[in-house]
Amino acid sequence: MTSKHIKQFVTVSLFIFLFVQCKTMKENRQDIKQFKSIYLDQFKLTYTRRLLQIGFNNSTSINNILDTDPRGFTERILSDADYHLIDSLVYQDNQIMITDSTNRIGMVAEGAEGKSVLDYLISKYESKWIDSVAKVRYKTLGVKKFE
């Protein structure tokens, strides 16, 4: 081979390598974004389901409703540590609701006494608190960013 052919071969090889590598990085970026979206959704959904269950004292009716929800889990995304964190958060939230309920006895109409699970859950969502917790937890996974 002449030096001209070697240069052409090296140039073409580098071009192909760089083209394939860039495409792979782009696909990785898309996969990471998709995984992040799925992870955050699963974290928030799990928190919501657990808060409803615990907030309504593991009511059979609530569990039946949650069991019929078509948005079930297809594969395990969250780790055991994630579930432990969610259970801890839900436990704390339930304690807050119980304390609030106890403090409201005699101060609100009879029908308004008790835990306000849906009010509490809506206020958590509106504050974006669970979003920020899920994002912080996602960052601890160490998923590499390609930007």
Per-segment meaning from a language model:
Residues I65-E147:
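Compact alpha-helical subdomains of small soluble proteins
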Residues Q30-R49:
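Post-signal peptide N-terminal segment of mature Sec-exported envelope proteins
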Residues Y39-F43, F56-S59, D80, G111-K115:
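Soluble non-cytosolic domains of exported or imported proteins
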Residues L45-T68:
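Post-signal-peptide N-terminal segment of Sec-exported extracytoplasmic proteins
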